[in-house]
Amino acid sequence: MPLQKNQVLTLTIERLSNDGSGVAHSPDGEAVFIPGTAPGDVAAIRIVKDCGRYAFGILDAIQTPSPDRIPVDCAVAGPCGGCSLRHLDYAAELRAKGESVTDAFRRIGGLDVPVLPPLPSPEIDRYRNKVQFPVGRDKNGKPCIGFYAGRTHRIVPCPDCKLQPDVLNEIGNTLCDFFAAHNIQPYDEQTSKGLVRHVFLRRGVHSGQIMVCLVCTRAKLPHAEELCRALTAQFSDIATILINVNARNTNVILGSETHTLYGPGFIEDTLCGVPVQLGPLSFYQVNTLAAEQLYGIAAEYAQLTPDDLLLDLYCGMGTIGLSMADHCRELIGVEIVPEAIESAKANAARMGDAIAAKSRFFCADAGKAASQLAAEGLHPDVVMLDPPRKGCDEATLSAVVTMSPRRVVYVSCSPSTAARDAKWLEEHGYRAEKVQPVDLFPRTRHCEVVSCYTKTM
């Protein structure tokens, strides 16, 4: 019998889904997905939509709380939705992430590969080195920063996001005060009027340097010099202030035009000893300390020797490969984004002549480059794969297998696509040795995985 809208059921939450919702079953066996619940909760659930084989519900009341449930310490955690697991004890969060990775490799990959316990993040709050606050107005009409409520473009004001360092929240709030005092208008998506769309902040965890970037509909910002003086006087770690221009009617945050108001236009930091320069368009892991753990695992799995050639596909700014360059004979990196390749070359140069001499970076599609390198007879000893969420296409994996590396190390932000690609590699002569989940995103459902493969044929 179909579930009815607004019907209330008492259900026991069994597990978490991939998006962090609790999963329960109705008396008739229909799966019900309920955000904000924890495995072990017994709760009154109100049905909001029945889709036939499954339904969606909302939490009406907790009747018996899960032993893993903890108090939520953020007033806007519900409507904001950014911290989908903020109500869950961190040990339970790690267990859930480990179970999700294990399930993906067994169900999608068909593999009984050892999945190690997830590596916890060194920090579970205030860990992000980057934030992109949309700018809007609060209920009193004052400019505010916040985040979009789930599946909407309604801004939930959030003056103190628990995932951001205090200083980034403080800078965001100071900017809103400045906008209000000088009648600088937030952009309104409904009317396409206003100036400031986003406040984009970066912080170098090791350097302490901060980048402030205002995403605006035009390059001219009223009182820009006064703003620079006020910000740098109050926040001494601000190294650069920029305006990024995005006048399009789009959901894309950044435009292609950036102007520097103060400083060099970038900040500096290090990641696993690799010196990097970061601007608004730079791709960089948002949890620096956990990323260093992840890179350490990748290096351990690579088992490089001084005679090895390392091929780093989807290399980005080159940080993974360059962090291992001391341990191999030659490094080749491939990335499709031109700015990232220029950054990779500059990062190699900053590491000194010896690293620069053994490192080569090419701007190309990873699959096409891998196919060309395979056709040219390149035989890397180790291949590093760090694809986007969609994973590798078959042409890329086929080219990797043709090059016949001794080992393949696969870094992924999507356990499901990593498991799919693991199955392909297993079917083409590479055995999955082990999988290490690494928690780069505490309080959320996301989890990175590192897996390694050895040649068997």
Descriptions of predicted regions:
Residues G40, Q164, N287:
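Short, conserved phosphate/pyrophosphate- and ester-handling motifs at nucleotide-, phospho-/glycolipid
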Residues P2-T10, N18, A219-M457:
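Rossmann-like S-adenosyl-L-methionine
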Residues D60-V72, G78-P186, H206, L221:
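Extended interfacial segments that mediate partner engagement and assembly in macromolecular machines
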Residues F200-G204, I210-K220:
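Carbohydrate-binding surface patches
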Residues M1-V72, V76, F361, K368:
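Terminal RNA-binding accessory module
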Residues R46-D50, P134-D138, R202-H206, T456:
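Short beta-strand micro-motifs enriched in acidic
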Residues G22-P27, G146-A149, C213-V215, A344:
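Short, acidic/hydrophobic/Gly-rich beta-strand patch recurrent on exposed beta strands
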Residues L116-I124, E189, H198, R202, ...:
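Short, solvent-exposed loop/turn elements at beta->coil junctions and helix N-caps
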